[in-house]
């Protein structure tokens, strides 16, 4: 584990599936428009689906007093000519811990891991999520496009902003 302020950062593995499932479902329920998936879908998944997800990609967890308070994921791009890129996805910090450096610490951890293998990292963020957009800009991400009507929730459309940070 890596110390970051008062938070411990650690790679989440299959053994973390139960706590990962709990925080993931909390994220989907608390901020439904911020995620492409839905609570109603993932709440029915067996624990093994979360174990598989943890085995497939690089997930970082932020702990405070042994409680998982934040998560984020690094997903490599697969096509041969895109292997220099990875995506940071599924970023969530519990509301009581937002604005306290948790997301910043998780991004620093993921970017350090990504820099070992990738030249750049990408992310997409709900355009209406001003706090997240400001944070990502502060962390050095640059917007390069907007997808209009990227997601639809309760008959309302939401745009996504695409951002990139060059690591090399």
Which role fits each region the language model picked out?
Residues 123-133, 150-156:
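Conserved beta-strand-loop-alpha-helix junction that forms the acyl-donor binding cleft
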Residues 107, 114-125:
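Conserved GNAT acetyl-CoA-binding A-motif
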Residues 14-17, 21-22, 26-96, 107-109, ...:
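Acetyl-CoA-dependent GNAT
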Residues 100, 104, 128-146:
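Conserved active-site alpha-helix within GNAT-family acetyltransferase domains
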Residues 2-6, 11-14, 159-168:
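Terminal substrate-recognition subdomain of acyl/acetyltransferases
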């Amino acid at each position: 584990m890596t110390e970051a302020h008062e938070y411990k950062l650690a790679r989440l593995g299959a053994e973390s599936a139960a706590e990962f499932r709990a925080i993931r479902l909390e994220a989907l329920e608390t901020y439904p428009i911020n995620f492409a998936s839905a609570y109603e879908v993932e709440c029915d998944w067996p624990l093994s689906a979360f174990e598989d997800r943890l085995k497939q990609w690089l997930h970082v967890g932020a702990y405070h007093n042994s409680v998982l308070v934040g998560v984020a994921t690094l997903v490599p791009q697969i096509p041969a000519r895109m292997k220099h890129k990875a995506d940071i996805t599924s970023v969530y910090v519990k509301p009581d811990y937002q604005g306290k450096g948790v997301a910043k610490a998780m991004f620093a951890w993921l970017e350090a891991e990504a820099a070992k293998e990738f030249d750049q990292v990408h992310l997409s963020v709900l355009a209406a999520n001003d706090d997240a957009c400001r944070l990502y800009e502060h962390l050095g991400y640059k917007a390069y496009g907007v997808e209009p009507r990227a997601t639809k929730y309760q008959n309302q459309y939401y745009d996504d902003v695409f951002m990139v940070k060059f690591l090399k």
